[in-house]
Curated annotation (Swiss-Prot):
This is Hemagglutinin-neuraminidase. Residues 46-571 are virion surface. Mediates the viral entry into the host cell together with fusion/F protein. Attaches the virus to sialic acid-containing cell receptors and thereby initiates infection. Binding of HN protein to the receptor induces a conformational change that allows the F protein to trigger virion/cell membranes fusion. It is found in: Virion membrane; Host cell membrane. Belongs to the paramyxoviruses hemagglutinin-neuraminidase family. The chain crosses the membrane at residues 23-45. It comes from Newcastle disease virus (strain Kansas).
Amino acid sequence: MDRAVSQVALENDEREAKNTWRLIFRIAILLLTVVTLATSVASLVYSMGASTPSDLVGIPTRISRAEEKITSALGSNQDVVDRIYKQVALESPLALLNTETTIMNAITSLSYQINGAANNSGWGAPIHDPDFIGGIGKELIVDNASDVTSFYPSAFQEHLNFIPAPTTGSGCTRIPSFDMSATHYCYTHNVILSGCRDHSHSHQYLALGVLRTTATGRIFFSTLRSISLDDTQNRKSCSVSATPLGCDMLCSKVTETEEEDYNSAVPTLMAHGRLGFDGQYHEKDLDVTTLFEDWVANYPGVGGGSFIDGRVWFSVYGGLKPNSPSDTVQEGKYVIYKRYNDTCPDEQDYQIRMAKSSYKPGRFGGKRIQQAILSIKVSTSLGEDPVLTVPPNTVTLMGAEGRILTVGTSHFLYQRGSSYFSPALLYPMTVSNKTATLHSPYTFNAFTRPGSIPCQASARCPNSCVTGVYTDPYPLIFYRNHTLRGVFGTMLDSEQARLNPASAVFDSTSRSRITRVSSSSTKAAYTTSTCFKVVKTNKTYCLSIAEISNTLFGEFRIVPLLVEILKNDGVREARSG
């Protein structure tokens, strides 16, 4: 029995000893494994130069820097993609469209001529040099961000003078009119042999030409056809327009002074003429007794016309017959435009009374002086289908000289500041069914004209007067949505006298640095401006045709002043009045 127990106890002791050694072996193996792993990790860390915990603090910063580098690289690539997209999707199609437009204009012009060949309308439609394709009649500067007055005119550039000057001391050249289409330009002025105040006889110079560039890249206006209309007709206040058939011109024919004309009972004779590409001039008198039956005096606006939708559009103005239907419909209508940051101190009722009286100045016998727009169908038959639009005086000021302009798809009417409002005005104009509609104007507070008191350059209140001078602005700078931002023009920088012609770029309140013709005592009168671009060089130029005093040969010499439009960081010069 005891032996059996001893045998069992011995077996238990042996089993426990085996278990103990197994445990020791397992622990030893586990420790060895841990040591080996630790050694391996340490070796790996050492070999890779890994950071210690204290180094890990800078990891987020390094990650941010790496992210910035990646973002910058992606942004740079995006700029390249954007430029490629702009070139492929925007600029190239636009250039092709401009080329197509010019070609279509030339084809249209040729089509008109072919259709009128039997009527001897002329052949050989001219066209500007290719450098100007897409740079005429377009929105030349499209810029949403830059200060308008950071654009400014260069010094006047020497170029070929395409305008004849007086050749005697008593000669007078006055009243320039200019218009340029995508294919050619038209120019006209009045010539009086015995001083600028003679109303009994004058002749009219009319020319057609194109823009050229010389071998050295200089611009010149090349006259291809011209004529001097020296006959028994006394054409006055002529406006010219470049159309597909040549140079269309609207003139009044007068034999009396302006005051006498307004005191007469019948409308003023008017004629629609054309200088064709063959150099021949033809003319037709309009039926003014029907077209202007409510008028006692009627004149073209002097400024250029515009070819729109198969018709030529001219600004006209004059006096209405008292109590005629056209006069009655305007009774009580008026508009008051205000100066920028310079409010009229007069009582509102008094301002309204003076504004109403401004349409009937005493100089013209109390007649209502009205603004209007005349459109004529362009065909081989002159004077065809004339339509007169008389805008309401709730939009326009007293009737005055003016100009119709087309830039891009926008049309404008410039109205001379003959009444109390001195800053330049450009009315947006829409056309439909042969008639025009004018809208509230853009005003350019620093682009003023001199005038007699109480309608001088700094005037701010409605008054009755006939004063000022013709100095039109040309739409130059636009927003991308085609809204007008700024204009170019040559103003007479004087309070009352016609002195000190100066060119500048203007926004609604101020002007750029200026380029003066000469000293502040230089006498001048009418100016008309047109801008265009040399697409090859992407340079924008503006032409101001200005009447400048000429003491040796005639009272005035008409000079084409050419500037390039430059850009800097902006030099603003506000008019203080």
